[in-house]
């Protein structure tokens, strides 16, 4: 399992530490985690990644002051390309956003540009930001993942230790194209051990994956410690290795914490992720 959990790159994170909250703009609050920490143990390297994708963040607690001192509120969407050198640590992201609270900005466009600049610098990669006024997104329906939900199987599970071996010999001879969904994805934060709850959609074309084996595999994340983005890349890599589909997309949407939710997707084919929040978001 992860050999990087005590890596020096994680030692300075504010995550899990007593924290001072700032309400005036401080970009230095952002903290990066190198993606290579979990990619290298999986045999993933920048010049030969088997997937594209992004981490889609939703910002529910974003506020600043306009030039006249009147508070502004927005919902933000940040798309961080999976090819970036770093991922952005979520608690530092929250603290950074808090630093906007008592800071004056000329207009919404300035806020968006500053967010893009700072987040791109932290991630060392491409970041896009959209800001929405509340009336623009009020009334949007709760979405759902297309596909067959594998959660209602009548099986006994008594082991919750991560085990990619559940996917070994877990395919048949029939070639199919399908989408499978589970709401039972749960892992733990790498630093704090706090639970992370998610729904995952697996879209593939290839030998049919045994649904019992896949469910056992996903449930085995239940006591596993990794960041959201890392779990999705592990799922993608394990399915690609053991099940050898012709095409594969893995998309997870996690419940929010600290006013943020993280929704990573990875794919080796054309894939357009839905943006609607799910029922637990």
UniProtKB/Swiss-Prot annotation:
Q: Tell me which GO cellular component terms the UniProt record holds.
A: cytoplasm
Recorded hits in PANTHER family, A to Z, give:
NADPH-DEPENDENT 7-CYANO-7-DEAZAGUANINE REDUCTASE
- Its EC number(s): 1.7.1.13
SUPFAM superfamilies the UniProt entry points to:
Tetrahydrobiopterin biosynthesis enzymes-like
Indicate the quaternary assembly.
Homodimer.
Give the GO terms filed under biological process for this record: queuosine biosynthetic process; tRNA modification
Entries under Pfam families matching the protein:
QueF, QueF_N
* UniProt: substrate binding residues: 88-90, 228-229
Residue sites binding NADPH per the record: 90-91, 257-258
Q: Report the catalytic activity.
A: 7-aminomethyl-7-carbaguanine + 2 NADP(+) = 7-cyano-7-deazaguanine + 2 NADPH + 3 H(+)
Where found in the cell?
Answer: Cytoplasm
Entry function: Catalyzes the NADPH-dependent reduction of 7-cyano-7-deazaguanine (preQ0) to 7-aminomethyl-7-deazaguanine (preQ1).
Active-site residues (renumbered): 189, 196
| One term of GO molecular function | preQ1 synthase activity
The family assignment reads: Belongs to the GTP cyclohydrolase I family. QueF type 2 subfamily.
The molecule here is called NADPH-dependent 7-cyano-7-deazaguanine reductase
Keyword Cytoplasm set for record: yes
Q: Organism's domain of life?
A: Bacteria
Q: Which InterPro entries match?
A: GTP-CH-I_C/QueF, NADPH_dep_7-cyano-7-deazaG_red, QueF, QueF_N, QueF_type2
Q: In which pathway does it act?
A: tRNA modification; tRNA-queuosine biosynthesis
> What UniProt keywords are attached to this protein's entry?
Cytoplasm, NADP, Oxidoreductase, Queuosine biosynthesis
């Amino acid at each position: 399992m992860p050999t990087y959990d005590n890596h020096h790159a994680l030692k300075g994170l504010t995550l899990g530490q007593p924290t001072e909250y700032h309400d005036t703009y401080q970009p230095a609050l952002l903290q990066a985690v190198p993606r290579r920490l979990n990619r290298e143990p999986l045999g993933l390297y920048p010049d030969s990644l088997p997937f594209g994708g992004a981490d889609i963040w939703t910002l529910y607690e974003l506020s600043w002051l306009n030039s006249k001192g009147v508070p502004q509120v927005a919902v933000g969407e940040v798309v961080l390309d999976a090819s970036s050198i770093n991922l952005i640590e979520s608690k530092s992201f929250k603290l950074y956003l808090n630093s906007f609270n008592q800071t004056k900005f000329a207009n919404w466009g300035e806020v968006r540009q500053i967010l893009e600049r700072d987040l791109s610098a932290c991630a060392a990669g491409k970041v896009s930001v959209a800001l929405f006024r509340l009336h623009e997104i009020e009334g949007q329906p709760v979405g759902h993942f297309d596909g067959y939900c594998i959660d209602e199987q009548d099986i006994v599970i008594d082991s919750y230790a991560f085990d990619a071996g559940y996917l070994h010999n877990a395919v048949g001879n029939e070639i199919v194209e399908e989408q499978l969904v589970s709401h039972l994805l749960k892992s733990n934060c790498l630093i704090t051990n706090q639970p992370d709850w998610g729904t995952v959609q697996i879209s593939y074309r290839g030998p049919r994956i045994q649904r019992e084996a896949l469910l056992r595999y996903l449930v085995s994340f239940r006591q596993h410690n990794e960041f959201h983005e890392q779990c999705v890349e592990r799922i993608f890599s394990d399915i690609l290795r053991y099940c050898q589909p012709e095409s594969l997309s893995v998309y997870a949407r996690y419940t929010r914490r600290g006013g943020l939710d993280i929704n990573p997707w990875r794919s080796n084919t054309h894939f357009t992720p839905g943006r609607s929040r799910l029922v637990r978001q």
